[in-house]
């Protein structure tokens, strides 16, 4: 097979050769350990699924400490250029630089490449230790908006010239008198746009249609923040009705029917929509949602939410099924085709080089990558092997200490077990 070819995109669709070149960022701390295990598992799955007809050619690019030590930069322009050119990449955890400049390398990558969806599927693998009674009821896919909200990075420190100007403008030009302690306040700005909302909700509904999911829930705090989070909810409903028509039934439609014809008619309309296989578009206030994912998780399927809510929700849900050590993630621009698949946990520097930590997060992010390429046969091999390996209680230390009768293995050995269990 040839040395490797570039993935291309035409009309928003990936053209994937049989031997795609995929850039990878090894990651800091435990990054080399987990990448060593994960890359072998992904390669073995592709080999087994396609018997040598398909193969990934990895291309290393640099970010984080490794980049800084090599180039003096935490996120070299060359790395961004390579990912732009090759479209798809996978990365381990990165250290956030101490001091000024880039606040978070992960956020910088998302913003530079406009990766507007943070995709976080949450599902349970039988046998994984969980703090909840029925973790198997949790099966959701989170679409978190990645570029806006309070995480946009528009923030000014207490006492700075910028914050003084901003507070003065708010007080004098807009007659704002709600800043309780203006002399000692830092200020952050929360932009939420109709375009940003629309492309996120569109991606979530498209995913629900493509994967046979039953509902999309818009999670927000619009009861308090009416013109940002409330607008997110309203724009989401408007987009669903305008672009998807009879493929969906929204709670906004439900409310209109209830107002005009009564609740019985609205309930009947929703039941008929469900029976017809339409996707129900609904909403939930964030604090109530965080209760209900514990008390009735099987009522939720695909979730679309803003940046800050999505951060909380993704990690809270991950805890219900075993923690972020086994939580995959991807950052995707569904319009340009660019995507970075990533470990969702930190660098855990105290375990660096010990061949100890659980590589499942980056392995399962690799599964998302394979699915994104359309290589579902290889992705399924990894999932089934993960199910089999965990069910047999052969696990890394983080799970072994919480499981009766477990066999504790190293990071690399867990990868080897996964390869053995592929069938």
UniProtKB/Swiss-Prot annotation:
Family stated for the protein in its record: Belongs to the isocitrate and isopropylmalate dehydrogenases family.
EC number(s) stated in the UniProt entry for this protein: 1.1.1.42
Cofactor binding note from Swiss-Prot or TrEMBL: Binds 1 Mg(2+) or Mn(2+) ion per subunit.
Note: The enzyme can be phosphorylated in vitro by the E.coli isocitrate dehydrogenase kinase/phosphatase, but B.subtilis lacks such an enzyme.
Disulfide topology: none
Recorded name of the encoding gene: icd
Positions of transmembrane segments: none
Catalytic activity: D-threo-isocitrate + NADP(+) = 2-oxoglutarate + CO2 + NADPH
Molecular-function annotations in GO: isocitrate dehydrogenase (NADP+) activity; magnesium ion binding; NAD binding
Site note Critical for catalysis, residues: 151, 221
Function: Catalyzes the oxidative decarboxylation of isocitrate to 2-oxoglutarate and carbon dioxide with the concomitant reduction of NADP(+).
UniProt protein name: Isocitrate dehydrogenase [NADP]
Cofactor(s) required for function per UniProt: Mg(2+); Mn(2+)
Oligomer and partners: Homodimer.
Species this chain originates from: Bacillus subtilis (strain 168)
GO biological process: glyoxylate cycle; tricarboxylic acid cycle
Binding of NADP(+), residues: 95, 345-351, 358, 397, 401
UniProt: Mg(2+) binding residues: 311
Top-rank EC class of the record's enzyme: oxidoreductase
Chain positions recorded as D-threo-isocitrate binding sites: 104, 106, 110, 120, 144
Keyword field: Glyoxylate bypass, Magnesium, Manganese, Metal-binding, NADP, Oxidoreductase, Tricarboxylic acid cycle
Pfam families per record: Iso_dh
């Amino acid at each position: 097979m040839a040395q490797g070819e570039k993935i291309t995109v035409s009309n928003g669709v990936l053209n994937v050769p049989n031997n795609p070149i995929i850039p990878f960022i090894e990651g800091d701390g435990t990054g080399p350990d987990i990448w060593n295990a994960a890359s072998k598992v992904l390669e073995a799955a592709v080999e087994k699924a396609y018997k040598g007809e398909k193969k990934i050619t990895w291309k290393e690019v640099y970010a984080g400490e490794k980049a800084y030590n090599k180039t003096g930069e935490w996120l070299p322009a060359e790395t961004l250029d390579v990912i732009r050119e090759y479209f798809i990449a996978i990365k381990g955890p990165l250290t956030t630089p101490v001091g000024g400049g880039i606040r978070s390398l992960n956020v910088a990558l998302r913003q530079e490449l406009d990766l507007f969806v943070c995709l976080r599927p949450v599902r349970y693998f039988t046998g994984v230790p969980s703090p909840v009674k029925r973790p198997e009821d949790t099966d959701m896919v989170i679409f978190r908006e990645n570029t806006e909200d309070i995480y946009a990075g528009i923030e000014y420190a207490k006492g700075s010239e910028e914050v003084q100007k901003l507070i003065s403008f708010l007080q004098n030009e807009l007659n704002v008198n709600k800043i309780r302690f203006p002399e000692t306040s830092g200020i952050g700005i929360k932009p939420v746009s109709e375009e940003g909302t629309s492309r996120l909700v569109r991606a979530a509904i498209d995913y629900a249609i493509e994967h046979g999911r039953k509902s999309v829930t818009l999670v927000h705090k619009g009861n308090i923040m009416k013109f940002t989070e409330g607008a997110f909810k309203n724009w989401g409903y408007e987009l669903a009705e305008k672009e998807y028509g009879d493929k969906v039934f929204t709670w906004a439609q439900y409310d209109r029917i209830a107002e005009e014809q009564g609740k019985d008619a609205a309930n009947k309309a929703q039941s008929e929509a469900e029976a017809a296989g339409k996707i129900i578009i609904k909403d939930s206030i964030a604090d109530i949602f965080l209760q209900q994912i514990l008390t009735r998780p099987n009522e939720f399927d695909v979730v679309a939410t803003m940046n800050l809510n999505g951060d909380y929700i993704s990690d809270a849900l991950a805890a219900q099924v075993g923690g972020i050590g086994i939580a995959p993630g991807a950052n995707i621009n569904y319009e340009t085709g660019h995507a970075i698949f990533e470990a969702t946990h930190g660098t855990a520097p105290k375990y660096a080089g010990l061949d100890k930590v659980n590589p499942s997060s980056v392995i399962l992010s690799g599964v998302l990558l394979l699915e994104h390429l359309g290589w579902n046969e290889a992705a399924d091999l990894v999932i089934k092997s993960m199910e089999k390996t965990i069910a047999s209680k052969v696990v890394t230390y983080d799970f072994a200490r919480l499981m009766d009768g477990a066999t504790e293995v190293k990071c690399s050995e867990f990868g080897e077990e996964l390869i053995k269990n592929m069938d």
